[in-house]
Amino acid sequence: MGTNQILDEIREVNLSYLLLAQQMLREDRIAAMYRLGIDEDIADILVKLTNSQLLKMAGSNMLLCRFRFDDSLIAEILTSHKQDRALTQSHAAILMAGLPAEKIS
């Protein structure tokens, strides 16, 4: 996979992520902020972005979304194949809810 193809893939992922984030925020702001791991300032910015701004942001050479966990325990919980999947997901959600929302530096 060449550099240009990787950049195209990043652009696609970014645009999909931004569009999904906007849709989620418009439908249920509080739940979206929780699921996206963002604070109100970032939510306000995302909702107000025009199509032109979305495309400009998506064209960045870095991914705009990232893993919300640095803890191997959460990764392990999310990937485990235990029978009670709902309980496992709830446990991971509780652990991730304790993580701070992202701030713009």
From Swiss-Prot:
GO BP term, pick one: bacterial-type flagellum assembly
Complexes and interactors: Homodimer; disulfide-linked. Forms a heterohexamer composed of two FlhC and four FlhD subunits. Each FlhC binds a FlhD dimer, forming a heterotrimer, and a hexamer assembles by dimerization of two heterotrimers.
Compartmental location: Cytoplasm
GO molecular function annotation: DNA binding
Pfam families: FlhD
Protein's name in the database: Flagellar transcriptional regulator FlhD
Organism whose genome encodes this protein: Nitrosomonas europaea (strain ATCC 19718 / CIP 103999 / KCTC 2705 / NBRC 14298)
Key words of the record: Activator, Bacterial flagellum biogenesis, Cytoplasm, Disulfide bond, DNA-binding, Transcription, Transcription regulation
Note on domains (UniProt): The C-terminal region contains a putative helix-turn-helix (HTH) motif, suggesting that this region may bind DNA.
Gene: flhD
Lineage of the organism: Bacteria, Pseudomonadati, Pseudomonadota, Betaproteobacteria, Nitrosomonadales
CC annotations in GO: cytoplasm
